[in-house]
Amino acid sequence: DGFESVWVTSMGHLMGLFDNEWLGIAPTGKMIFLRYCEFNKIEHGKITETAMFFDIPHLMMQAGLQPFLTQTAAHLVQPGPVTHDGLMFGEQDPKEGEKTLAAIDFMVNDMRDWKDAKKLPLVEELRRSWNEDMIWWGPAGIGATYTIERYAEQHSGPFRAAFTDRIFNGHLCRFAEGKFGGFFGWPNLTLTPTGEFMGMPTKAKPIDMRVIDMYRREGSKLTENWIFIDFLYFWNQQGVDILARATGIGMEDEPPN
């Protein structure tokens, strides 16, 4: 809508004691963190639309379940910005927001066609958009990684190798305020797997991916990135019920020998 609408975003963890079963996940009786990100559209002083994302596999792993076979990067409870300045309750310099949005757009456009053989090697391409000490706070199933070289090794390279065709479906919200910005789509991408992703076999048919990206800019480049991917929905399109497989809920009993 030409950046005419107003959106407010919140991201972090909901903390509590996991004392009751949830989605078939057995309680632990211990503290647990539910990673979330929400986008709220504001009209006439009231919320008119909300998009709410939860990293449910992240909670499952804290509860002792292993919903995925392997992770290429680190599993941890993800902190807020290194600069501890992510809470913005006052007006920000519009010029800083414009710089952040420009950095995000440059990165997205620079990687738009990852099959182009004439492009730079991956690490060199990433250096055009990212600071060397970048941190990529990825979702459960992939994990978090630090520095451009490790990001290329532990996520960006394997991700690009896992898919062939990529269709960009657009964003429902894309914004920047100060040194922070982000976007989400429903879905953002349609991808065709090449045969394996996250250590699991895939079928070569187009599937949708719902993604949230939140960024922090430092200087002229991006330096932190928090990612949410709806992997329960993603794998369900491949015929895999991650919740049922990890918890046993809804799974048919195996026939007797």
Task: Say what each PLM segment does.
Residues 1-257:
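C-terminal and inter-domain tail/linker signature
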